[in-house]
């Protein structure tokens, strides 16, 4: 935790209200995000109980599994979910624009520019908290290898159409959520926690109701009191007024309301199956419908408060102006979405359960590179974030007190002006350490030369971005009296070493993938618990 974050938390405790840790919004928010509030069944890993899903805050679609242990009902739930999610994704897949991309020419081996399609926008999925992201990944894995009756007429318990496709998309969203700065799949508690500091622990910030109580408490109520009320207050039935954001449910809800309702549903279904004539079957069907309606009402009572809280949180975030580099990161999300769309269109198989060595190394390198890029861009976009880097000795700001023109040695001398900056910061500078400042959106480098006046003055030598002439371009060198900020971290991240092709994977990393990798993986084996 940075010093700025620590101070903000202390100030939140003192004032009774969450304090901002950012002056701009560092994540892109779509104009029409798809919000998903899922619930799972206690004791059944990954077994969905229900969900509220949709793009209209006033008209969410309620999906319910009245008996979560029934495979057919689970598949029906997933089919309904696919009917909502896939059309939403398709609205972005067809709207494209022309773009250029560097690719390797197979004949010459050189990098050349080619014109390709890029989706003009991309879908965005919002879940209440981090466990919601993990559930999306779990659902994606459980669905993408399923076989439909059309794909394999002999498969037992075939999946409904589009369920495997939904699994592939959810897997892509889940994988993209692991890339720092990506906004295709967002957990609202994490985004809110990035922009505000509360007076409670990071673990307590995972409770969406408590987090919002600190950020936007009722008039006259301290944040700590409002958060405690959100966590503990119960109604006359002993149920939480602000239920957990899911996907796990409150044990009191499971034991007192949900379990008896599911038992009544099971009894009604058994009675319907045992009905001996049409009149009795009509009566039993009415009982089954009433039991299912009761479960739907229970699920909606647990998901609707969270649904409203998610949209309230989005309103708070939209009040912040978007950071300058958030658009660039969203463009990379658009490229990712376009690439996955193209892979599906080309008929490629689902993502494997386990990545090969080269793919895994590439993913790890990408995440490390994107984390460094995100840290740098947030500081460049936000003076409050930059203040934290300055306190950590990773940047410094001050006033230019002197500029002395100097030149490099050699046949073609180049300008290397010496710039003296007066600063109250204490950056961790060493001999010939490079520092960077933003000049017209591009990083300009300088070398540390030395300190003067016990560190109050920092002398730098500017080394690039001054043009090709013997004299620096106008505006490329700081002038006396300018306020400037230099960082010790690079603004742009360089790509790592090129990894070998998959067929050239060294034996130290398992060797080239075998033929078995090319065979499409099958779904998990069917167990007795899958079907009632």
Where are these regions (language model features)?
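Metal-dependent DNA phosphodiester-chemistry modules and their immediately adjacent helices/loops
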Residues: 115-124, 128-256, 263
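Conserved nucleotide-binding/hydrolysis modules and their immediate coupling elements
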Residues: 386-478
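Accessory interdomain/linker segments of ATP-dependent helicases and helicase-like nucleic-acid enzymes
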Residues: 7, 285-429
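Short, surface-exposed beta-strand/loop "edge" segments at domain boundaries and coil↔beta transitions
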Residues: 42-49, 58-61, 132-137, 426-431, ...
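C-terminal effector modules of nucleic-acid-centric enzymes and ribosome-associated factors
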Residues: 123, 436-440, 444-532
């Amino acid at each position: 935790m940075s010093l700025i974050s620590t101070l903000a938390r202390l100030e939140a405790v003192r004032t009774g209200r969450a304090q901002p840790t950012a002056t701009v919004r560092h994540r892109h928010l779509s104009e029409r995000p798809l919000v998903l509030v899922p619930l799972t069944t206690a004791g059944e890993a990954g077994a969905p109980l229900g969900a509220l899903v949709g793009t209209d805050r006033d008209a969410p679609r309620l999906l319910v599994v009245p008996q979560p242990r029934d495979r057919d009902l689970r598949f029906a739930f997933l089919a309904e979910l696919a009917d909502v999610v896939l059309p939403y994704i398709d609205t972005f897949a067809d709207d494209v624009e022309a773009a250029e991309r560097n690719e390797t020419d197979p004949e010459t081996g050189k990098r050349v520019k080619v014109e390709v399609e890029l989706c003009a926008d991309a879908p965005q999925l919002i879940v209440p908290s981090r466990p919601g992201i993990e559930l999306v990944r779990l659902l994606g894995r459980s669905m993408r290898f399923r076989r439909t009756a059309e794909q394999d007429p002999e498969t037992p318990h075939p999946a409904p159409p589009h369920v495997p496709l939904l699994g592939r998309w959810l897997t892509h969203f889940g994988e993209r959520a692991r890339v720092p700065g990506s906004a295709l799949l967002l957990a609202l508690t994490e985004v809110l926690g990035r922009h505000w500091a509360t007076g409670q622990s990071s673990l307590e910030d995972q409770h969406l109701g408590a987090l919002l109580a600190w950020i936007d408490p009722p008039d006259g109520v301290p944040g700590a009191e409002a958060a405690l009320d959100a966590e503990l207050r119960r109604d006359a039935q002993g149920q939480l007024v602000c239920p957990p954001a899911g996907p796990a449910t409150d044990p009191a809800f499971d034991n007192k309301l949900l379990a008896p309702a599911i038992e009544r549903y099971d009894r009604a279904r058994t009675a319907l199956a045992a009905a001996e004539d049409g009149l009795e079957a009509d009566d039993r069907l009415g009982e089954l419908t009433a039991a299912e309606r009761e479960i739907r009402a229970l699920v909606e009572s647990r998901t609707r408060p969270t649904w409203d809280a998610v949209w309230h949180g989005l309103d708070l975030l939209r009040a912040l102006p978007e950071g300058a580099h958030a658009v660039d990161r969203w463009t990379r999300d658009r490229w990712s979405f376009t690439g996955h769309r193209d892979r599906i269109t080309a008929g490629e198989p689902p993502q494997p359960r386990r990545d090969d060595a080269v793919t895994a190394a590439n993913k790890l390198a990408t995440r490390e590179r994107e984390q460094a890029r995100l840290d740098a861009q947030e500081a460049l976009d936000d003076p409050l974030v930059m203040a934290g880097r300055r306190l950590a000795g990773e940047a410094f700001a001050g006033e230019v007190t002197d500029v002395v023109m100097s030149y490099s040695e050699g046949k073609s001398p180049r300008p290397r002006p010496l710039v003296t900056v007066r600063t109250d910061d204490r950056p961790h500078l060493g001999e010939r350490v490079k520092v960077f400042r933003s000049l017209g959106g591009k990083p300009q480098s300088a070398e540390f030369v030395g300190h003067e006046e016990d560190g109050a003055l920092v002398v730098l030598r500017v080394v690039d971005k001054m043009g090709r002439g013997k004299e620096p371009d106008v505006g490329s060198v700081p002038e006396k009296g300018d306020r400037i900020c230099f960082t010790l971290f690079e603004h742009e991240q360089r790509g790592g070493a090129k990894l070998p092709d998959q067929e050239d994977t060294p034996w130290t990393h398992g060797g080239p993938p075998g033929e078995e990798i090319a065979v499409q993986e099958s779904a998990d084996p069917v167990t007795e618990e899958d079907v009632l």
